[in-house]
Regions:
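Well-ordered, non-membrane alpha-helical segments in soluble/globular domains
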Residues: 20-45, 70-78, 99-113, 140-151
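Buried hydrophobic core signal strongest for RNase H-like alpha/beta domains in large
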Residues: 3-5, 52-66, 76-79, 88, ...
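Generic structural signal marking isolated hydrophobic packing positions
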Residues: 1-2, 160
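Substrate-binding cleft of secreted/luminal carbohydrate-active enzymes
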Residues: 92-97, 121-171
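Aromatic-lined carbohydrate-recognition surfaces of secreted/lumenal glycan-active proteins
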Residues: 25-73, 90, 120-133, 159-165
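Glycoside hydrolase catalytic-domain groove-lining segments
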Residues: 70-138
Length: 171
């Protein structure tokens, strides 16, 4: 979850809003260098082992995509446009209010992913984490998930990783 690396640990108070702009800029610049270095290493490894059945792809994961759409400094709008990665992964909890939010997030990440790597599919945005706390959901989880999955399939999302088959949150 790249935004937590960029911002610091998650908690109820939004400390990111209090971080000075020059510090945010420096964090983004360093994050960009790190991700580009990782991709370069993966590219070199792929080049050195050409005849393997194993395919290795590098993804950058964003987890605060919806605020990135609104212009808040985030991985999606301040790092992703400046790196080359094979895939973009979205830990998509912030886009689960509706299939429309999921679509907005996927479109935003697709637009920001300008320097594509070696992933062979047209759609390079994957869902790296998705799920609900069933015990506290005040809606039909199965119905919501179906509408979101349908939207992801419609948009040719290559991978969707459901985080919790059994609810791992305390009651």
């Amino acid at each position: 979850e790249g935004d937590w690396i960029l911002r610091g640990p998650a908690n109820k108070e939004d400390k990111w809003a209090k971080v000075p702009e020059d510090v945010k800029k420096l964090r983004c610049e360093n994050f960009i260098k790190w991700i580009n270095s990782r991709q370069e290493a993966i590219d070199k490894a792929r080049e050195s082992v050409k005849n393997s059945k194993c395919k290795v792809y590098h993804a950058l994961e964003a987890n605060k995509v919806m605020v990135g759409i609104d212009g808040v400094v985030s991985v999606s709008n301040s790092v992703l446009p400046f790196v080359k990665v094979d895939l973009v992964s979205w830990s998509s909890y912030d886009g689960l209010k509706s299939a429309k939010d999921m679509e907005r997030g996927i479109k935003h990440l697709s637009e920001m992913h300008r320097n594509k790597g070696a992933f062979p599919e047209k759609q390079t945005v994957m869902i790296g984490e998705i799920g609900f706390q069933e015990q506290v959901a005040n809606f039909d989880v199965a119905e919501r998930m179906k509408s979101i999955y349908d939207k992801c399939l419609e948009m040719d999302v290559p991978y969707i990783i459901y985080w919790e088959i059994y609810c791992n949150e305390p009651k």
